[in-house]
Each structure stands twice: as C-alpha cells, then as structure tokens.
Amino acid sequence: TTATNVFCGIISATSVDDYNNNIIKKHEGTLKKRELLFENYLKNTGFNAEPVLLTYPDNDIITSIKNKYKQKIAEYEFCTTDKNSHLLWVVDDENDIRKIVETFKEIDTLYIADGHHRSTSSCLLANNLAKENPEHTGKEDYNFFMSYLLPESQLSIYEFNRFIKDLNGYSP
C-alpha cells in the first residue's frame, strides 16, 4: 500500500523454465555486463534480494484465493522508510497452493514489468549450475527466482526517461 495505491499480488518462486520457454515475455534488452554482474551476485549470495515484477491477466480464481487470505490477520506487517506499508499472508493450505499452481499453468503468458536483468541473470546462473550438476533434476533451488505476480488491472507503468533530468518548471 502506498499513499495512492493498494496492490495485492503473490510472491512466489518462478521457474526459469517459464523464462526459457518464453512463457514469460521480455520487452527490454539487457546489458551483458549487468547480466554477468547480477549472476555473480546470485552465485555468491544464493539470494534474490528483490523480486522480479511479473504481470498476468486478471483471474477470478487467483483473486478469490487472495481475498480469502485478506480476511485473516496478516502474518507479517511492516512499513518501509518511504512510508509504504506491506501486509504479507502465508498461503499454506495445500489445496489453495494446488489451485494457484494449476491456474497459473493455464495462463499462457506472463510479462516482465520490472526486473529484466534479474530474471536473465537468474536464468544464466540456473543454466550454468545445471551444466555443472550431473544429478540435475530441475527441482533444485537455483531453477527458480523470486517474483511478485501482480494482475494487470493493478499495474501502473510510469514513464522512465534516462535523458531528461529537469522539466524546467513544466509538469509531466
């Protein structure tokens, strides 16, 4: 929750297979230098510090499961330094987890809204570790990256312009 918006998504482990098989759509190029930097970071820390923001078409099944949990007290609640509040519910009911997984299997396309370098570097690392692992099964932790799945109706995209630093008194 921000001063002007409320978002309700799912934080999950997303398979690099979905990235490699183009279920997750990319719309930006990435810089090889940054890909390698992030891959090295992941290899050294073993930790995704920030989720990749993925968006999907609104879905009534997913929404109803999220709404069920929102009726309960959140497991975690915190406020960031920029005054954004966060409530986190743990989905631990096996039936709900199964429904979420099955529903996302039916969604043909996810789009990267933020995190092209993070997702690419996660895939690079997974592919490299798979080659090094003679017992690779596809279920290892390195085959997944942290993502925040948000329905497209809740997504707000703001212009980002690297070249304009000052509007000289004009409003956007």
Each language-model region and where it sits:
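Surface-exposed, charge/polar-rich loops and edge strands
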Residues: 1-172
